[in-house]
Amino acid sequence: RSAQAYGAQVLTYHRVTSVEREGERISAVIVHDERGGEDIRIECGFVLNCGGPWAGQIAAMADCHGVDVVPGAGIMIAMNHRLSQSVINRCVWPADGDILVPDHTVCIIGTTDLKADDPDRLSIPADQVQQMLDSGEAMIPGFRKSRAVHAWAGARPLVKDSRVSATDTRHMARGMSIIDHNTRDGIYGMLTIAGGKLTTYRLMAERIVDIM
C-alpha cells in the first residue's frame, strides 16, 4: 500500500512469461493476466527480480542461468480455537509441528519443510497433516480436541547451500542472497534476490533498492 501511495502500479494475478533484452540490456518484461487472459508488455530500464521460489525461472528468461533457488515446501494448519496467548516453540532440533502461533480467534501450527519440485504444484499430504496434529498434542495436551479448519502450503525461496544435501531444505541457510547480473552474467538492468524470511523482508527490500 505504501508503494501504491507513492505511485506504484500493482498487478496481481499476473505471471511473468518472458524478459526482453536489447543487446546486453534488459528492456521489457512480458506478463500474462491469469484472470483476463491478455498479455501485457512492460517497458523498463531496470528489473528487481523478487520472484521468490520462481526467481531462478525469471532470471533464466533473461539468459541468466544457474540461479539456484530451491523451493522448500511447508504446510501450516489453523485450529478453531486460540489455545495460547503467546507463541509456543518447542526447544528441540528443528522438526515438523514445533511452533504454535495464536492469531485472532485461532491458532496456527507449523510447519513441514521438504524440497518441492514445482512451487506451482504444492500438495498437502494427509500423513503430514496427521504428523503436525500429533506434534501439536505433544506440545499442548488437549490440542487434538480442537478442530482443524484450514490447511495451506507455501514454498520458501531458499538459496542452494553447498554445506547440506540438495534436498535438505530444513537445514539450508535462511540468509538473503542478491545477484547483480551485470557483474555475474554481463546483462545490465537486473538484480535477483532470494533466500531470507518473512521477518527480514523489509531489510531485503531496502538492500536490493539501495544496490539498484
Kindly give the residue locations of the regions a language model identified.
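General small-molecule cofactor/ligand-binding pocket signal
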Residues: 9-11, 149
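Flavin (primarily FAD) cofactor-binding/catalytic cores of flavoenzymes
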Residues: 2, 13-16, 32-36
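Core beta-strand elements of the Rossmann-like FAD/NAD(P) dinucleotide-binding domain
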Residues: 35-46, 50
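C-terminal catalytic lobe of FAD-dependent flavoproteins
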Residues: 2, 57-61, 65-75, 79-108, ...
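A conserved short coil-to-beta-strand element within the FAD-binding core of flavoproteins
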Residues: 12-27
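Short, surface-exposed charged micro-motifs
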Residues: 9, 18, 43, 97-99, ...
